């Protein structure tokens, strides 16, 4: 078929006298060529289309694999529609009402739109909070970062097989999941040289990758780390993590005293069970459905969500933890039983987290931590090595108790200051309101006086005497002022 | 119901990232090799009973630590209350062997005034073809620091029991001799619930020793 036009072409070249036929032939030839070319183009186009279909099928397949987890809380149809509307606004970068988002998020998030919703929440967060210049990440594109080499390569490679090792998307050695994870972690380690790579980050990156593309995940990782400040806890000195452990311990002390005492008696400090909660945002131990829900709230509120979830988890299981009688059984419970709770329990936890507000306490405890550290340092300078240990121990215990008492007092004082401050604020706003009221009244008064002047000029002199009489009357009875003033 | 034990020892397992600390512990406490595992973020805890002599059981509390350097600010807090330690390196990773010295220094600073009885463990000995550290040089280094040396494999279950029980025995001897004593405010060694039978046999052993002197 394909050769035929050529044969005709070749044979037709020598025959001179039969020009008409030749022309006819060449026309045929041309049309045949046209047809052939046309078909070739069509073929190519179909092939391309086919490839596209295949790619989208692959993507769908991988999306299915990525999102294959049981959701905590089912999303109603109406909620889906509201999210659709919100996501449209997202493109226009319109600032949404916080209260509104909060309600919507509480209702649920469909997992198929979760990635987009996180990006929407990040945008909203950025519209409300601007980062000071100092804390901004360097402005280098993801593609540019991928071209470079990282000193953290070994540490990252080693963790690839240990991040969600049983999840089908990440389990294949150097499969698509692990490759994306490597790229993302490498790029971040190059962007944030101070943090580089810290164990725990791979889980956060992994959760993001299950819901969006690599580049979007990079943008969202940047958001969590810089805008919301999660990067602090991964810094080489891990100071911030220590503070967080202290804050959690204090929260337990203040709100769940029995549980706190029980854990203290058995020498279980938060660093033993809560470090992975903070560093992997619950992703290394808890089910993906729960983790995704926690991430929903993190994208809305930031780092304090981890405390809320931790507190809610511990308090919801308080009776069971109290029943564990020794160190081993408590650790076992916190490590294995707690992350394994059922979906309805998880839903309850999430609902509780939406209703909590502990930002003031967290702030106060952070201040406390620093005060305590300073005091500890001073006292360690003061004491001498030769003193008997027992005495020091006793003094230490006493000081500890004293510290606790003082801390409680400090907290009360903080609360008092807070109420006083809010009172003051109220008074100040009232004062300014009053001041502006006075100003408007004065202006009004001047206007009236002017009107009176004008009226006086317009009136004949004999009427003026009458008027003055009236005015005197008015001064005695100010309620009539407005009425008379309006009369020309 | 709490099992009956004579003493409780607290052990700590340290060493570079990915030398196989968690796998070794899990082989010892759970009796299986974990094909997939998460990295240890912070510290983790395991426990097991060991019978060192018929009727004499010791409870081991084993603390697993994160290997990545920046986690030391957290794991450090757990050195002080440990009586024994397994210092791991990977025989197929020379770097992890070179860091042994640094690990010892690190613990020394933070364990004072107490001391940790260490055993040096060359791990992953099933991967002999990829070996980068010879047995001879590891033994030499261990001797220089007054430690025992043992090679183990969690995958093939080689010497895992031995590594833990030998260390436990050594500590037990030190406790018996009075070189390590139970102290208030220190969790390294605790004495447990001792039934009368065991107690009396202990007394017998003690009096016999006294006679020998």
UniProtKB/Swiss-Prot annotation, chain B:
Modified residues (Cysteine methyl ester): 213
UniProt function note: The small GTPases Rab are key regulators of intracellular membrane trafficking, from the formation of transport vesicles to their fusion with membranes. Rabs cycle between an inactive GDP-bound form and an active GTP-bound form that is able to recruit to membranes different sets of downstream effectors directly responsible for vesicle formation, movement, tethering and fusion. RAB39B is involved in autophagy and may function in autophagosome formation.
Family label: Belongs to the small GTPase superfamily. Rab family.
Listed name of the protein: Ras-related protein Rab-39B
Localisation per UniProt entry: Cell membrane; Cytoplasmic vesicle membrane; Golgi apparatus; Cytoplasmic vesicle, Autophagosome membrane
Enzyme Commission identifier(s): 3.6.5.2
Amino acids binding GTP: 17, 20-23, 37, 40, 67, 123-124, 126, 154-155
GO-annotated molecular function: G protein activity; GTP binding; GTPase activity; myosin V binding
Taxonomic lineage from the root: Eukaryota, Metazoa, Chordata, Craniata, Vertebrata
Domain remarks: Switch I, switch II and the interswitch regions are characteristic of Rab GTPases and mediate the interactions with Rab downstream effectors. The switch regions undergo conformational changes upon nucleotide binding which drive interaction with specific sets of effector proteins, with most effectors only binding to GTP-bound Rab.
Lipid-modified sites (S-geranylgeranyl cysteine): 211, 213
PTM-bearing positions, type Phosphoserine: 201
Keywords: Autophagy, Cell membrane, Cytoplasmic vesicle, Golgi apparatus, GTP-binding, Hydrolase, Lipoprotein, Lysosome, Magnesium, Membrane, Metal-binding, Methylation, Nucleotide-binding, Phosphoprotein, Prenylation, Protein transport, Transport
Gene that this polypeptide is encoded by: RAB39B
Oligomeric and partner information: Interacts (GDP-bound) with C9orf72; C9orf72 in complex with SMCR8 acts as a GEF for RAB39B. Interacts (in GTP-bound form) with PICK1 (via PDZ domain); a PICK1 homodimer may allow simultaneous association of RAB39B and GRIA2 to PICK1 which is involved in GRIA2 trafficking. Interacts with isoform c of RASSF1; the interaction is strong. Interacts with isoform a of RASSF1; the interaction is weak. Interacts with the DLG4/PSD-95. Interacts (GTP-bound) with HOPS complex components VPS39 and VPS41.
Family annotation (InterPro entries): P-loop_NTPase (IPR027417), Rab39 (IPR041818), Rab_GTPases_membrane_traffic (IPR050209), Small_GTP-bd (IPR005225), Small_GTPase (IPR001806)
Residues annotated as binding Mg(2+): 22, 40, 64
Catalytic activity: GTP + H2O = GDP + phosphate + H(+)
Cofactor(s) listed: Mg(2+)
Record keyword Transit peptide present: no
GO BP term (any one): regulation of autophagy
Region (Switch-I): 35-43
Annotated region (Switch-II), positions in chain: 67-83
Domain of life of the source: Eukaryota
Claim: Transcription is one of the keywords in the record: no
CDD domains according to UniProt: Rab39 (cd04111)
GO cellular component, one term: plasma membrane
């Amino acid at each position: 078929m394909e050769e035929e036009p050529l044969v005709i072409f070749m044979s037709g070249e020598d025959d001179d006298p039969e020009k008409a036929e030749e022309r006819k032939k060449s026309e045929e030839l041309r049309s045949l060529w046209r047809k052939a070319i046309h078909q070739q183009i069509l073929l190519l186009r179909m092939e391309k289309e086919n490839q596209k279909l295949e790619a989208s099928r692959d993507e769908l397949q991988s999306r299915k694999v990525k999102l294959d987890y049981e959701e905590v809380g089912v999303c109603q149809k109406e909620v889906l529609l509201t999210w659709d509307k919100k996501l449209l606004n997202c493109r226009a970068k319109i600032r949404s009402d916080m209260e509104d988002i909060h309600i919507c998020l509480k209702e649920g998030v469909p997992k198929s739109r979760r990635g987009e919703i996180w990006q929407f929440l990040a945008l909203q967060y950025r519209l409300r909070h601007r980062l000071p210049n100092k804390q901004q990440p360097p402005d280098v594109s993801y593609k540019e970062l991928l071209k470079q080499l990282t000193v953290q390569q070994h540490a990252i490679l080693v963790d690839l097989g240990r991040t969600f090792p049983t999840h089908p998307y990440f389990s294949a050695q150097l499969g698509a999941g692990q490759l994306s994870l490597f790229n993302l972690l490498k790029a971040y380690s190059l962007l944030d040289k101070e943090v580089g790579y810290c164990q725990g980050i791979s889980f956060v990156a992994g959760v993001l990758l299950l819901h969006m593309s690599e580049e979007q995940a990079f943008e969202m990782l940047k958001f969590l780390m810089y805008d919301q400040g999660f990067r602090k806890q991964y810094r080489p000195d891990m100071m911030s993590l220590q503070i967080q452990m202290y804050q959690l311990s204090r929260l337990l002390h203040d709100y769940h005293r029995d549980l706190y005492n029980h854990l203290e008696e058995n020498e279980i400090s938060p660093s033993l069970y809560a470090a992975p909660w903070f560093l992997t945002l619950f992703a290394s131990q808890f089910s993906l459905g729960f983790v995704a829900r926690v991430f929903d709230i993190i994208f809305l509120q930031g780092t304090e969500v981890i405390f809320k979830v931790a507190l809610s988890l511990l308090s919801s299981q308080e009776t069971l933890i109290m029943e564990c009688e020794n160190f081993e059984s408590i650790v076992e419970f916190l490590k294995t039983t707690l992350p394994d709770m059922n979906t309805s329990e998880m839903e309850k936890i999430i609902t509780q987290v939406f209703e909590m507000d502990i930002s003031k306490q967290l702030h106060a405890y952070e201040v406390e931590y620093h005060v305590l550290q300073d005091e500890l340092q001073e006292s360690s300078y003061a004491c001498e090595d030769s003193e008997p240990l027992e005495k020091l121990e006793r003094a230490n215990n006493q000081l500890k108790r004293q510290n606790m008492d003082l801390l409680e007092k400090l907290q009360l004082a903080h609360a008092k200051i807070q109420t006083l401050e809010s009172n003051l604020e109220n008074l100040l706003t009232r004062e300014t309101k009053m001041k502006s009221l006075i100003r408007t009244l004065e202006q009004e008064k001047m206007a009236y006086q002017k009107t009176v002047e004008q009226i006086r000029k317009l009136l004949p002199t004999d009427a003026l005497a009458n008027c003055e009489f009236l005015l005197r009357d008015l001064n005695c009875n100010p309620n009539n002022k407005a009425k008379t003033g309006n009369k020309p | 119901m709490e099992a009956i034990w004579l003493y409780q020892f607290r052990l700590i397992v340290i060493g570079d990232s990915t030398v196989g600390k968690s796998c070794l512990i899990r082989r010892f406490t759970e009796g299986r090799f974990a094909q997939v595992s998460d990295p240890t973020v912070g510290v983790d805890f395991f426990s097991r009973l060991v019978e060192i002599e018929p009727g004499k059981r010791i409870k081991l509390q084993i603390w697993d630590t994160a290997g990545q350097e920046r986690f030391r600010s957290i794991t450090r807090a757990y050195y002080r209350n440990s009586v024994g330690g397994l210092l791991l390196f990977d025989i197929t990773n020379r770097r992890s062997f070179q860091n042994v010295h640094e690990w010892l220094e690190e613990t020394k600073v933070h364990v004072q005034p107490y001391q940790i009885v260490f055993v040096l463990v060359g791990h992953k000995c099933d991967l002999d073809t990829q070996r980068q550290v010879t047995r001879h040089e590891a033994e030499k280094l261990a001797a220089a620091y007054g430690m025992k040396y043992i090679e183990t494999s969690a995958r093939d279950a080689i010497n895992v029991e031995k590594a833990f029980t030998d260390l436990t025995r050594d500590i037990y001897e030190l406790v018996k001799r009075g070189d390590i004593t139970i102290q208030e405010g220190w969790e390294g060694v605790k004495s447990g619930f001792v039934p009368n039978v065991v107690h009396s046999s202990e007394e017998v052993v003690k009096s016999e020793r006294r006679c020998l002197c």
